[in-house]
């Protein structure tokens, strides 16, 4: 049959190159199920509002369910998008006098905006679950290592002793903020634009609240012009994905470094490694390296979305067709990265003996030694900093005698004369004592870390319940939609 969209206004058919250039059919695979759901909800509402009769409603609903069963491959890919292709298939099945009524009071503009939001909210829910599992993996590993000493780093130089638990929880805290950002974005994604039509709404007596309810949205995007033209929710989500990928790339970088011969802190499971085509001894951390590289997918998608949306006049413009494929690439990459990082964390072998041995190299206890001088002798911290800095030049383990000789140069008197004892020096140079004394909120002291881990586990359980609630709401909505569809089909 002729193209149902172009046959009235346009005489010339598009050649293959133009069709390929303008078609979104391949990208629309993401929204096939969502488009069926939107059509079902819209048709139910049309019948309830008396815009179509019961018999036509039944035929349209049955046809839509048949199309869903057949799958997208049965659609005609010569159309420019899934919406027209799906409607054309429906008309083939039930005739134009019936199928041609489905689009009453609707535009592709509000239709596609609704489809995108349906798919995106499902992706967000899945991503929230996956972030939750990764955070749980980090906390579970941290609980085993609250007393496992390791060097902390600044500028990639040994800085102060800490624990593996403290380090892992730093990553979990960042992921917790990623979780919060994405969960917050969900509230702006889960709003319904359906009923906005092209941009000026419609003269048909539609019930927008009814389609919102049938599709499980939390509310309406009320201004019809804003409803069809806004893609700020895509930019917001892509920004959240980028932030998340940047945090994952930092974790991946550490896995690469820590698994090197020079560090030897961990060994990655063979599943996440590859070897060389020429050097048979190699075990390369390729998966973690690729995760660093794939951060560019998320960053690139965000930049593309910003560029596409920048400067667009109201309301709908076809530029927006190019926006969603960028988002789908980003969310696919990000979700896979989170799942794979969870697997790497769960299966990697930690080498506590190496971590402990490295915790004192590079004079990591220098800060505590300076702090001890301040607490025990009353000298200013900046003076203590100078004394310890001069001791660090010697590259030897400081003794009270050596400390006194340097203090004589700086202060004109020894620190032992001000009350410093050899026992105090030894305590300050003990890496475990360094960690144990740091028991203020957020510090690495084992007792503080155990309290912190308990609080984080409580927060994770609350997050799990919040995810379950989101899923229950949307699952219940679709169950009700299908129940209503089946009722109207039988009628």
Swiss-Prot record:
Main localization category: cytoplasm
EC number: 4.3.2.1
Pfam (any one): ASL_C2
Family statement: Belongs to the lyase 1 family. Argininosuccinate lyase subfamily.
CDD domains for this protein: Argininosuccinate_lyase (cd01359)
Gene Ontology MF, one: argininosuccinate lyase activity
Keywords carried by this UniProt record: Amino-acid biosynthesis, Arginine biosynthesis, Cytoplasm, Lyase
UniProt xrefs under InterPro entries: Arg_succ_lyase_C, Argininosuccinate_lyase, Fumarase/histidase_N, Fumarate_lyase_fam, Fumarate_lyase_N, L-Aspartase-like
This protein's encoding gene: argH
GO cellular component: cytosol
Top class in the EC scheme: lyase
Entry's Gene Ontology BP terms: arginine biosynthetic process via ornithine; L-arginine biosynthetic process
Reactions accelerated catalytically: 2-(N(omega)-L-arginino)succinate = fumarate + L-arginine
Highest classification ranks of the organism: Archaea, Methanobacteriati, Methanobacteriota, Stenosarchaea group, Methanomicrobia
Entry protein name: Argininosuccinate lyase
HAMAP family cross-referenced by the UniProt entry: Arg_succ_lyase (MF_00006)
Matches recorded under SUPFAM superfamilies: L-aspartase-like
